[in-house]
């Protein structure tokens, strides 16, 4: 099993079979069921973690390779980095970062109370180096847990796709309040025409590029245009916004699985310096 990766600014081109499948799957889940899924979103994610414990997602050691902001504090011993991992699940990004770098302090939150408890039970959990709390980023104020404009970097890794598109801007507004001016949100999530999107059966579609899994959890598949507009409408500036294409090849079984992610960086604009008021006689 091997993985090949490349990056690009254009969306993946579908095969004719894939295009035909998506054209056929136009029937949307009923409004009643959609409302029920929204009301039960937290319960469905909590049940997901109950079923899978800490075993579903692999630890993510690629974050420092892809995002230089997570490496910068290693250059000087006394340089500290305060980060927020929003929707961090059971700590698959959090703990590798804390283990690799003693100069990081992390705030971390998740929608699921069960996921938060799993993090607190991890042997690497240290209250001196991280603060973990339960939070619905669409309605719970991060300022109840994190001081305003105190965070150097926010990680939004495979989180926003689980939020209803109508509420995504609320997440971005929430994290904007705790991010320092001139600092970044690091984003990675499912991209348009990812293999997971093409595998959904008929009757799973909630809206444009938005689907429900059999367990009731939902997933949105991003275009670069949609994401850029979402961030910029909330006051951020685009720095990087590109597709990541990965092909997982199993030569023995003759399989090639096309994965598509969107990897991006958006900046909270720096504060303008106060204008210098000329003194008398100047």
Curated annotation (Swiss-Prot):
Entry keyword annotation includes Chloroplast: no
Keyword presence, Nucleus: yes
Location within or outside the cell: Cytoplasm; Nucleus
GO molecular function terms attached to this record: RNA methyltransferase activity; S-adenosylmethionine-dependent methyltransferase activity
Listed GO CC annotations: cytoplasm; nucleus
Listed GO biological process terms: methylation; tRNA processing
InterPro entries per record: Methyltransf_12, METTL2/6/8-like, SAM-dependent_MTases_sf
Keywords: Cytoplasm, Methyltransferase, Nucleus, S-adenosyl-L-methionine, Transferase, tRNA processing
Gene3D superfamilies: Vaccinia Virus protein VP39
Enzyme class: transferase
Pfam families: Methyltransf_12
Catalytic activity: cytidine(32) in tRNA(Ser) + S-adenosyl-L-methionine = N(3)-methylcytidine(32) in tRNA(Ser) + S-adenosyl-L-homocysteine + H(+)
Main location: cytoplasm
Annotated S-adenosyl-L-methionine binding sites: 45, 49, 87, 110, 136-137, 157
Its EC number(s): 2.1.1.-
Organism domain of life: Eukaryota
Family: Belongs to the methyltransferase superfamily. METL family.
Functional description taken from the UniProt entry: S-adenosyl-L-methionine-dependent methyltransferase that mediates N(3)-methylcytidine modification of residue 32 of the tRNA anticodon loop of tRNA(Ser), including tRNA(Ser)(UGA) and tRNA(Ser)(GCU). Interaction with SARS1/SerRS is required for N(3)-methylcytidine methylation.
Subunit field text: Monomer. Interacts with SARS1/SerRS; interaction is mediated via tRNA(Ser) and is required for N(3)-methylcytidine methylation.
Name of the protein: tRNA N(3)-cytidine methyltransferase METTL6
Lineage: Eukaryota, Metazoa, Chordata, Craniata, Vertebrata
């Amino acid at each position: 099993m091997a993985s090949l990766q490349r990056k690009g600014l254009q969306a993946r081109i579908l095969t004719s079979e894939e295009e035909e499948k998506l054209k056929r799957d136009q029937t949307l889940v009923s409004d009643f069921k959609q409302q029920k899924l929204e009301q039960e979103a937290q319960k469905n994610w909590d049940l997901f973690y109950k079923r899978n414990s800490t075993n579903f997602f692999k630890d993510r050691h690629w974050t420092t390779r892809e995002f230089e902001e997570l490496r910068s504090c290693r250059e000087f011993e006394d340089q500290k980095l305060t980060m927020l991992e929003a929707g961090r699940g059971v700590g698959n990004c959090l703990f590798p970062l804390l283990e690799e770098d003693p100069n990081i302090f992390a705030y971390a939150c998740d929608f699921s109370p069960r996921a938060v408890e799993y993090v607190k039970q991890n042997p690497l959990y240290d209250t001196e180096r991280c603060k973990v709390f339960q939070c619905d980023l669409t309605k719970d104020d991060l300022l109840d847990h994190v001081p305003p404009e105190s965070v150097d970097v926010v990680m939004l890794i495979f989180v926003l796709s689980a939020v209803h598109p109508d509420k995504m801007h609320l997440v971005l507004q929430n994290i904007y309040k705790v991010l320092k001016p001139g600092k970044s949100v690091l984003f990675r999530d499912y991209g348009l025409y990812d293999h997971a999107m093409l595998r959904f059966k008929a009757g799973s579609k909630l809206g444009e590029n938005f689907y429900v899994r059999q367990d009731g959890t939902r997933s949105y598949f991003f275009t670069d245009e949609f994401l850029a507009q979402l961030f910029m409408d909330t006051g951020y500036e685009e720095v990087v916004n590109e597709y990541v294409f990965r092909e997982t090849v199993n030569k023995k079984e003759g399989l090639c699985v096309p994965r598509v992610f969107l990897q991006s960086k958006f900046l909270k604009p720096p504060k303008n310096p106060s204008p210098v008021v000329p003194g008398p006689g100047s």
